[in-house]
């Protein structure tokens, strides 16, 4: 077990610690993406309808969003290492439960439990990176983390398709078992403990319940809207969400260490970074959901061509994210974020202005701009969110980072559904235009951070 370090772990312990983070976050992100590809197969095998099989995906996402902040708070209480190891155990066992499921109900329950395990991993992974890396190299750690998330998100469908071509859908989950065991052994050997703190915060159960209801109802309503559910049901969910949310926020304002980190949101640099994150992930999801419809329906490209034309975006993000991690050590995150998001907006506007029959190269280079711009923004923004919070509140900052990402992505997907319902085939153009405008707004908000002092790890 590594000793507590004042400024990061020494080598080679640092390599072992970051490896367990890489494996854990890869599994959590991949399992959010691979199930989509397998839904038709799962529905057929378990004798379920396509509509009901969507809950295999929804259950995982909802479980994550309702528990992220609670697990991050528990990380501040009991240590990020302990929560991470518990998350690995839950994720490993629930993956086995998923593979052994013989009904849709059983699989959905297993996915809920797996979502809680994934939330435990996501809630403290960036807080752990803050403990693993020395202050001067923290940007590189954030760059590696952003790189892994980008690779996992992009590779998820491909990995799922490869596994399904040679094995049953159960192996999508069984593959997590050996990986989880390796990650757990590495975590027990290399992950550092939290530093000592003067007092331990108290976990407030009513806050956790209200947090789950508020964010769970919001994500359920957004997902339901995107899937064309009853507007009456969606409106009822939103009304209950608002009522519970008001009581939730009022309670947080009265607590010395709140579950929803309103204390951190009072820090201008932190709140501006969270706002930038929500807007940028909303813009990203608006584009990524609408682009396949645009390429196939409007431009007449095949499914294979669509996949190839979309590939430059995640590839550019993967290349740029580690580079941005190095740049944050020298350039203000607000400037890097603004520049990256303006580049992303330029790529999106270029896609909006494409002619009726564009050459492939004229689709590819805007995709590269979008991916490179997003990669230039993401690592510095994550770095700022974590380092603008006090060290003892790193868990709260890490949980808020993940929550902002999920809220942005869910909102973006719902907006695409709205645009397609309102504007038909033109909805893809409107969605891309909305994404570009949101990217500009996010760039402007990021630019406001330049007036704030640079965060210190």
From Swiss-Prot:
Give the principal location in a single coarse category: membrane
**The keyword Membrane is annotated on this UniProt entry:** yes
Give the way it sits in the membrane. Multi-pass membrane protein
Highest taxon of source: Bacteria
Write out the GO biological process terms.
transmembrane transport
Instruction: Read off the Pfam families from this record.
Output: MFS_1
Please provide one cellular component term from the Gene Ontology annotations of this protein. plasma membrane
Q: Where are the transmembrane segments?
A: 15-35, 54-74, 87-107, 112-132, 144-164, 166-186, 205-225, 229-249, 269-289, 308-328, 334-354, 357-377, 400-420, 428-448
* UniProt family annotation: Belongs to the major facilitator superfamily. TCR/Tet family.
* PANTHER family assigned to the protein according to its UniProt record, in alphabetical order: MAJOR FACILITATOR SUPERFAMILY MULTIDRUG TRANSPORTER MFSC
Protein's recorded name: Uncharacterized transporter YebQ
């Amino acid at each position: 077990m590594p000793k507590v370090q004042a400024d990061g772990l020494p080598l080679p312990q640092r390599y072992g610690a970051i490896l367990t983070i890489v494996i854990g976050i890869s599994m959590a992100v991949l399992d959010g993406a691979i199930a989509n590809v397998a839904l038709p197969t799962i529905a057929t095998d378990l004798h379920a309808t396509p509509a009901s099989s969507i809950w295999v995906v929804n259950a995982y996402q909802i479980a994550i969003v309702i528990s992220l902040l609670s697990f991050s708070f528990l990380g501040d209480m009991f240590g990020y290492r302990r929560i991470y190891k518990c998350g690995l155990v839950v994720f490993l066992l629930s993956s086995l439960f998923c593979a052994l499921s013989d009904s849709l109900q059983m699989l959905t329950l297993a996915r809920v439990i797996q979502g809680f395990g994934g939330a435990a991993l996501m809630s403290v992974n960036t807080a752990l990176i803050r403990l693993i890396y020395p202050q001067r190299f923290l940007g590189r750690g954030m760059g590696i983390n952003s790189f892994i998330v980008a690779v996992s998100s992009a590779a998820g469908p491909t990995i799922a398709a490869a596994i399904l071509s040679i094995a049953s859908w159960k192996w999508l989950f069984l593959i997590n078992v050996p990986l989880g065991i390796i990650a757990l052994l590495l975590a027990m050997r290399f992950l550092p403990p939290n530093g000592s703190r003067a007092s331990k915060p108290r976990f407030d159960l009513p806050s956790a319940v209200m947090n789950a209801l508020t964010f769970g109802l919001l994500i359920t309503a957004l997902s339901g809207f995107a899937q064309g559910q009853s507007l009456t049901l969606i409106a009822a969910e939103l009304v209950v969400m608002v009522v519970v949310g008001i009581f939730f926020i009022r309670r947080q304002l009265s607590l010395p260490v709140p579950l929803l980190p309103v204390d951190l949101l009072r820090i201008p640099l932190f709140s501006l970074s969270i706002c930038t994150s929500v807007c940028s992930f909303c813009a990203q999801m608006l584009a990524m959901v609408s682009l396949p419809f645009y390429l196939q329906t409007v431009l007449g490209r095949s499914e294979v061509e669509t996949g190839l034309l979309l590939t430059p975006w995640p590839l550019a993000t993967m290349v740029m994210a580690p580079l941005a991690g190095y740049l944050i050590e020298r350039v203000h995150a607000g400037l890097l974020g603004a520049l990256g998001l303006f580049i992303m907006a330029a790529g999106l506007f270029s896609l909006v202005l494409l002619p009726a029959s564009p050459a492939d190269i004229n689709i590819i280079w805007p995709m590269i701009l979008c991916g490179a711009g997003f990669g230039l923004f993401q690592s510095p923004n994550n770095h700022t969110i974590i380092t603008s919070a006090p060290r003892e509140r790193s868990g709260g900052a890490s949980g808020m980072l993940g929550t902002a990402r999920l809220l942005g992505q869910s909102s973006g997907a719902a907006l695409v559904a709205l645009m397609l319902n309102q504007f038909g085939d033109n909805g893809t153009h409107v969605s891309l235009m909305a994404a570009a405008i949101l990217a500009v707004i996010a760039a402007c908000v990021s630019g406001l951070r330049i007036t704030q002092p640079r965060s210190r790890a």
